Amino acid sequence: MLKNVNRLILSICLVIVSACTTNDLEPTLANRITMVTSGDVSLVSKTYAWHQTMFSVHTKNTQDEEPLRELLRQSVNKVMAAKGYQQVAYTDSPQMLIGFGMALESEMSDTEILAKAGLVPGLSTHGVDKKLEKGSVLIAFFNPLVKEPYWRVLAQGFTEHNKSVDKRAAGFDALSKMMLSAIPSS
């Protein structure tokens, strides 16, 4: 009798457990981002200015390049101000310079990015919908007296290349916040 009760309980447990299913929640491709950083954030200083020559943007539509440049500058400025850093003019002898680069995969390959930046996150495009394109954003911090950056971060994600520039502001803010999360508050 006890064996029959144990078998019944075991059978019920097996039915209950086998009825349970799990779903892996994968982020949508549009939200997938990979990042790689290199350098020493302890060298970050209180005042900064924008690098005079490192601000390149490579897109399919050259008319979007200046608005995208300005969007990224604004987003980085917001993050840096929230962390207590002060932007100054280049002529006011900033303690550090911030530069950036941005490119779509159709305009610059991972091999080219690696050659220029020395970093590449290697986000795979296998099986990605053709309406999305891989984009890369590099942010680098420099000592004004040294040519090479002392800290840099490179992020890759997917973007809808047909999306208007004005609809990308929130995405730039979120990306800048994520990319600069390692920068300590001043």
Residue map of PLM features:
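Bacterial N-terminal signal peptides that target proteins for export
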Residues: M1-I9
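C-terminal motif of bacterial Sec signal peptides marking the signal peptidase cleavage site
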Residues: I16-A19
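C-terminal/domain-edge helix-coil "capping" segments
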Residues: T21-G39, D129-S136, F141-S186
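Compositionally biased P/S/T/G-rich terminal and signal peptide-adjacent segments
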Residues: T28-S56
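A short, structured loop/turn motif at beta-sheet edges
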Residues: S38-K46, Q87-P94, F141-E148
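Extracytoplasmic/periplasmic, Sec-exported soluble proteins
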Residues: S42, K60-L72, Y90, D129-E133, ...
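N-terminal segment of the mature soluble domain
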Residues: T47-E105
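Surface-exposed short loop/turn segments
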Residues: S93-Y150, Q156
